């Protein structure tokens, strides 16, 4: 693959190389929802199912739709390489409340919360329709709010408030508490970006 966008391509190439040496038995022992048929891993992301070939990486959408963006593919590689099942206790956390959240809160606010506020808070009806199209469950928080399953066992809530004459639109993203152990802070930023982009693509 010819590298044109180094910011996205270089991390992908790094994890693609590590993926070649991955032991499928190790993956399915850590991630109970991931299946391995001897040629492909089956992975579900935000309601869509993908086949990921191994050892020579290739990704296919089972629904025949578009394959994910390169940053999303990089995340899926990291998920297979590093993630594990962690039980959810049923509680929710903001990004700031999880390990290293305070350190990353400024870039996270701009990349995730402000973007979500002005993408969804200004178009609540379109947000609702997109979330429902993705199979998300409505929640009672915010002017509009929905719960999504990112990958098996890891849940997120996207909450949006419309602005008015005094206040701009607002948004909050909640993570099931197992994200604190299951994903590092950098991944939690990327995950928020993936969720926002996926909802937006369905609007």
PLM features per residue range, with description:
Residues 1-18, 38, 56, 65, ...:
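Charge-rich alpha-helical segments
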Residues 50, 104-112, 116, 140-142, ...:
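Domain-length accessory/inserted modules outside core catalytic folds
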Residues 48-74, 161-186:
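Intrinsically disordered, low-complexity regulatory segments enriched in Ser/Thr/Pro
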Residues 1-39, 71-72, 80-134:
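Short Lys/Arg-enriched alpha/beta "domain-start" segment
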């Amino acid at each position: 693959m010819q590298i044109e966008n180094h910011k996205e391509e270089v991390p992908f190439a790094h994890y693609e190389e590590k993926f070649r040496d991955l032991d499928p038995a190790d993956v399915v022992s850590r991630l109970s929802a991931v299946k391995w048929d001897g040629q492909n891993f089956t992975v579900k992301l935000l309601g869509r199912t993908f086949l990921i070939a191994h050892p020579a990486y290739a990704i296919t959408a089972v629904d025949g739709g578009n394959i994910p963006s390169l940053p999303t593919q990089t995340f899926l590689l990291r998920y297979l390489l590093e993630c594990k099942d962690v039980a959810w206790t049923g509680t929710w956390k903001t990004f700031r409340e999880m390990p290293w959240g305070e350190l990353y809160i400024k870039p996270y606010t701009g990349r995730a919360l402000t973007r979500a506020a002005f993408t969804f808070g200004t178009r609540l009806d379109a947000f609702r329709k997109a979330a429902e199209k993705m199979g998300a469950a409505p929640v009672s928080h915010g002017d509009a709010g929905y719960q999504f399953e990112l990958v098996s066992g890891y849940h997120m809530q996207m909450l949006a408030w419309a602005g008015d004459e005094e206040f701009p639109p607002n948004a909050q993203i909640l993570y099931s508490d197992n994200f604190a152990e299951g994903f590092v802070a950098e991944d939690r930023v990327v995950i928020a970006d993936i969720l926002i982009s996926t909802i937006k693509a369905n609007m």
